[in-house]
Amino acid sequence: MPYTWKFLGISKQLSLENGIAKLNQLLNLEVDLDIQTIRVPSDPDGGTAADEYIRYEMRLDISNLDEGTYSKFIFLGNSKMEVPMFLCYCGTDNRNEVVLQWLKAEYGVIMWPIKFEQKTMIKLADASIVHVTKENIEQITWFSSKLYFEPETQDKNLRQFSIEIPRESCEGLALGYGNTMHPYNDAIVPYIYNETGMAVERLPLTSVILAGHTKIMRESIVTSTRSLRNRVLAVVLQSIQFTSE
């Protein structure tokens, strides 16, 4: 079944392990918390200390609830960044809003919805592919891909249009470019521009679909499994950093 993830920026980095007991009491159930320190290199030739993140995964114990009810929260933080943390969550449990309000009250944080720009959506597509590295690009799983655009005109004379790239073409374009950890950004999107004159990052991109795997939209991501890759999480955190004008 598909899982829809929503994303919220957080004004400071949280230490969730200190508050789980209170959350258990509030929800009257056990909250399963997993804490990891992960490294997601931004440079294909290696990583730095700036590429180290703390990842919290918080799952509500739903053993006594309906099978169709579930809830998961993932937090990613890096204390060296100006915006040090964000969270994403999926699930049908009505306790999700309770958890969000508790986080604001318990830690005194400000949260805001994250909206992805076109360039970020392409980066997320790259990050969604299974373990892309310079060494294994020939072994990764490729997906038929579709980019949807929805122009906004005063009289609504233009409607949604899309570009579809078959799985074999995605693979061929990426391999033809050479070893790259960013096949969509480095090979597929430039090919679209060269062949059509359409600059994807300047068009009203509304979604990127990797068939049967991931759908990336402006305000959410839909996955086929109840998880998000570390590289996807890192791209999201990097995308919400403030930039000086």
Swiss-Prot record:
CC terms in the record's Gene Ontology section: kinetochore; nucleus; outer kinetochore
UniProt-annotated location(s): Nucleus; Chromosome, Centromere, Kinetochore
GO biological process: one example: protein localization to chromosome, centromeric region
Entry keyword set: Cell cycle, Cell division, Centromere, Chromosome, Kinetochore, Meiosis, Mitosis, Nucleus
Lineage top rank: taxon: Eukaryota
Presence of the UniProt keyword Cell cycle in the record: yes
Keyword Cell division (UniProt): yes
Family the UniProt entry places it in: Belongs to the CENP-L/IML3 family.
Protein role: Component of the kinetochore, a multiprotein complex that assembles on centromeric DNA and attaches chromosomes to spindle microtubules, mediating chromosome segregation and sister chromatid segregation during meiosis and mitosis. Component of the inner kinetochore constitutive centromere-associated network (CCAN), which serves as a structural platform for outer kinetochore assembly.
Miscellaneous notes: Present with 125 molecules/cell in log phase SD medium.
Subunit structure: Forms a heterodimer with IML3. CHL4-IML3 is part of a larger constitutive centromere-associated network (CCAN) (also known as central kinetochore CTF19 complex in yeast), which is composed of at least AME1, CHL4, CNN1, CTF3, CTF19, IML3, MCM16, MCM21, MCM22, MHF1, MHF2, MIF2, NKP1, NKP2, OKP1 and WIP1. Interacts with CHL4 and CTF19.
Name under which the protein is recorded: Inner kinetochore subunit IML3
Organism: Saccharomyces cerevisiae (strain ATCC 204508 / S288c) (Baker's yeast)
Species classification: Eukaryota, Fungi, Dikarya, Ascomycota, Saccharomycotina
